[in-house]
């Protein structure tokens, strides 16, 4: 009876949402446990009823034979999810993607931001901000409540830097079929996870603007590979420019303009790079 219920639900999903233009991928659930033989059967069942999309058994768990794509932290070839940046950018995770099957990196990033206690008054409904209140009271008990704003600001900027590094690492990986974040907003349930650049109310935390975020997470992104970030003044910087383009059209201009500015925005150097 239980398995029949899942089959009925799958048919209902395909019937109700089958013609939606964004319904490209179907997955039975997130990080599932239990009977993977049945999950394989259910995946086959979905494929037999609707061949317009790709099907997968579960994220971040066992492979099932019937699935057409896989969402996980790693494959049998290696890791495919990035959690932090490195002292250089001349790297990628192509090795983990060489399986012959599309792989989507699961829950990239997951950087926590220190709680913003100014959010507490926004909880006016049946949900109370007891988690935030506990963190606030703990900070006060340790005599550091005056540092709350600094902790929030500094951890937020670290999160901004980390997300930029890990997302650019994904985009440099030409064999990757994509990535997904744990969430753009804070996750208030099942254990508090303040991983968002937006709070639980979908409001900006002031960590980064949408325009700055799209500089490294967009259909087209300029990338630069280099061996290290710190140089002596007698060393020469060298790097390799790349262009990630998943937009609907090709770039018509063959050259890319670049410039280097100082902290005041003054242009120090500029030039052009010919694209291959």
Predicted regions located by residue number:
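Substrate-binding/catalytic cleft of secreted carbohydrate-active enzymes
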Residues: 1-198
């Amino acid at each position: 009876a239980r398995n029949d219920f899942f089959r009925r639900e799958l048919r209902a999903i395909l019937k109700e949402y089958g013609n939606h233009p964004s319904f490209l991928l179907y997955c039975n659930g997130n990080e599932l446990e239990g009977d993977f033989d049945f999950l394989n059967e259910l995946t086959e069942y979905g494929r037999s009823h609707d061949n317009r999309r790709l099907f997968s058994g579960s994220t971040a768990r066992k492979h099932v034979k019937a699935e057409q794509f896989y969402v996980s932290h790693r494959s049998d070839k290696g890791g495919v999810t990035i959690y932090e940046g490195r002292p250089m950018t001349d790297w990628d995770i192509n090795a983990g993607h060489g399986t012959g099957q599309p792989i989507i990196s699961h829950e990239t990033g997951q950087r926590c931001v220190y709680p913003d206690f100014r959010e507490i008054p926004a909880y006016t409904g049946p949900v109370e901000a007891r988690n935030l209140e506990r963190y606030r009271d703990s900070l006060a008990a340790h005599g550091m409540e005056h540092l709350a704003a600094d902790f929030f600001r500094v951890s937020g900027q670290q999160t901004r830097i980390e997300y930029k590094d890990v997302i650019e690492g994904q985009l440099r990986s030409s064999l990757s079929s994509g990535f997904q974040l744990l969430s753009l907003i804070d996750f208030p349930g099942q254990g508090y996870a303040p991983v968002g650049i937006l709070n639980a109310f979908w409001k900006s935390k002031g960590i980064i603007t949408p325009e700055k975020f799209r500089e490294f997470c967009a259909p087209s992104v300029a990338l630069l590979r280099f061996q290290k970030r710190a140089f002596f003044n007698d060393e020469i910087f060298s790097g390799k420019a790349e262009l990630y383009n998943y937009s609907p059209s090709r770039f018509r201009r063959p050259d890319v303009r670049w410039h280097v500015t100082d902290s005041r925005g003054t242009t120090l150097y500029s030039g052009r790079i010919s694209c291959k």
